[in-house]
Amino acid sequence: YRSIWTPEGSPLMAQSIAQTKALTTSLSSKARVALAMRYGQPSLESVLDELYSQGHRRVLLIPTYPQYAASTTATVTDALSHYLLSRRDQLEVRTIRSFPTEPAYIEALARSIEDTWAERGRPNFAAGDKLIASFHSIPQKMHDQGDPYRSECVATVEALRARLNLSNDELLVTFQSVFGHAEWLGPATIDT
């Protein structure tokens, strides 16, 4: 991790803070924007306590996992439910489940790719170059039990292909970060 750390610290935290500031600016004084972490600080519980103490009673919770998975998004809503069980005067809470094909999300991905192409050159797809969309994998068992994660990852890539005018052979869907001996979603990025 030392090689990816920035002067601001964790890249995830630095990006999350930047997103919070951008959303705060975008919404102006229409809403209070707060950053909460599921596995870190500031914790979801401490942020909800702070919002409550400031008089806020309505919360829109947006987990920053674009594709829903029980192992990610559901843990946020589970933590929220556990928090609400401990309160007598409950907050009114809405959650965003996922946003795999949200136009603004797809546009942000496409612009990031196009910016990279402008800086480093577009791949030579005619010569066999590939663009790989690599998602964190989940155990195959979770998929078999009905977890929609894989289909939402594929939906993201299909929308990105359409936006970038790429074929299935030019923009591939792969999965990474497997561990243990169980079967995981594939194809594996490392084998692609």
Where are these regions (language model features)?
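Active-site-proximal alpha-helix that buttresses catalytic centers in soluble enzyme cores
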Residues: 1-192
